Design a protein with these regions (language model features):
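A conserved regulatory-domain signal marking ACT and ACT-like small-molecule sensing domains
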Residues: 267, 272-389
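Single conserved hydrophobic/aromatic residue that forms the stacking wall/gate
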Residues: 1-6, 10
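General beta-strand structural signal in soluble alpha/beta enzymes
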Residues: 18-19, 34-35, 58-61, 84-88, ...
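Rossmann-fold NAD(P) dinucleotide-binding segment
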Residues: 19-61
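Catalytic, metal-anchored helix/loop core of enzyme active sites in primary metabolism
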Residues: 110-113, 121-124, 140, 145-150, ...
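Substrate-binding/catalytic subdomain of NAD(P)-dependent oxidoreductase enzymes
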Residues: 136-234, 239-241, 260
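Rossmann-fold NAD(P)-binding glycine/threonine-rich loop
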Residues: 42-53, 63-92, 97-101
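Rossmann-like NAD(P)H-binding beta-loop-alpha module
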Residues: 78-159, 166
Length: 389
């Protein structure tokens, strides 16, 4: 029941409460265990595992638990012919698990992408609209309850990585593999990146992407430049948005609140009704016996256009040296702007590259950093032009 209900005298008298969490996993009067504790270790893991072993259905909103132990727990659920449902674990009020696991199952999904963390989207929206620094916006988000007191999992991209890793497993019939997911958060983005992005016709979003091409998988979470006119640039504040590409319908777009008591509670109740109606699905889409171990590509092997921001001395010949370092790796420049830097006698050189392999870009950046005229700060952000209309 909602936490406010536990403080009600009538509720306390009419509902059996216990401080012995593990007893729920073995209690013969319990048919369905709902776990909303959180975390991948400790009591949450122990009680869910024990409940499944004792042939009890489990509903959870714990994406960290499933991203770390999803293969093991799914196998136990399958062996005991019980449900392990987790609609509330991904994108709050958006029924994305049901859509991917059931409704679009036969449509040959080839890509899932979007905004899966409301805290980051709220912060990036405020930075874009108000030209504020990251730390100031984070403090404001914490005061308003949009960010946790310890926001590490959110702002470092870990929460979004948990979610896209699970969706990838369901969509592409592969085991859950969080370690193979590339993760980069939003902490290095500052207000000037938004200023430059806007001038170039872009905004910045934390995107989660999972895709399958032939027998290769991509799983990644990182900030991206997206076109200002695109639909995804307009997804603001704590709202989540997910696109599922398939070979039958094409783009299936889902948008809604990513967290909160109402959306989370609605998803939990949806899972509960499925169990009561006798609806059973393999937790990760198919039997664990049918999961295929496909190669998950490293980010270094992928190719993107890039935004490069280089702080360098404002003197003749510097741009020629930077261009030479890029051309050695056959990296061509689409556009360039130069702005005064906060530092005296320095300039901010902003480049947009054509599509290039990330390993090549990183090699060029190393060479650029060694130039005596360049400060140690060379920033790059990947550009996603093709994902969203």
């Amino acid at each position: 029941c909602p936490s406010r209900g536990l403080g009600d005298v009538y509720k306390r008298q009419s509902l059996p409460l216990t401080t012995d969490t593990m007893s729920l996993a073995t209690n013969d009067n319990v048919d369905i265990l709902i776990e909303l504790i959180g975390g991948s270790k400790g009591i949450a893991y122990k009680v869910v595992k024990k409940a499944l072993q004792n042939k009890k259905h489990v509903i959870t909103a714990n994406k960290a638990l499933l991203a770390v132990h999803g293969n093991e727990l799914s196998k136990i659920a399958e062996q005991n012919n019980v449900c392990l449902n987790y609609e509330a674990a991904i994108a709050g009020g958006i029924p994305i698990v049901k859509a991917v696991r059931e409704n679009l199952r036969l449509n040959k999904i080839n890509k899932i992408y979007g905004i899966l963390n409301g805290t980051c989207n709220y912060i990036l929206t405020k930075m874009a609209n108000n030209a504020e620094d990251f730390k100031n916006v984070l403090n404001d988000a914490q005061k308003k309850g949009f960010a946790e007191l310890d926001p590490t999992f959110d702002i470092q991209g870990i929460d979004a990585a948990h979610k896209i890793t699970l969706l990838s497993s369901i969509a592409f019939d592969i085991p859950v593999n969080l370690k193979a997911t590339f993760i980069e958060g939003i902490t290095k983005i500052d207000k000037y990146d938004f200023v430059f992005a806007k001038e170039l016709g872009y905004s910045i979003k934390l995107l989660s992407v999972a895709s399958k091409k032939l027998s290769k998988i991509e799983q990644r979470v990182h900030p991206c430049f997206v076109k200002l006119k695109s639909d995804i640039a307009k997804v603001s504040n704590e709202i989540n948005a997910v696109v599922v590409n398939d070979s039958v319908i094409g783009k299936n777009i889902f948008e809604g609140p990513g967290a909160g008591a109402g959306p989370t509670g609605a998803s939990v109740m949806s899972d509960l009704m499925d169990i009561i109606r006798g609806t059973y699905n393999y937790p990760l889409g198919v039997s664990m016996k049918k999961k295929k171990k496909l190669k998950i590509q490293k980010i270094d092997d992928l190719s993107f256009p890039y935004y490069l921001r280089i702080t360098a001395k404002d003197k003749a010949g510097v741009m020629a040296k930077i261009s030479k370092a890029l051309s050695k790796r056959k990296i061509s420049i689409e556009s360039i702007i130069q702005k005064p830097s906060k530092r005296s006698n320095f300039a901010e050189i902003i480049l947009i590259t054509h599509t290039v392999k990330e390993s090549s870009l990183l090699s060029s950046i190393k060479q650029i950093k060694r130039l005596p005229e360049v400060s140690s700060s060379v920033k790059f952000i990947r550009i996603e032009d093709s994902l969203w209309p």
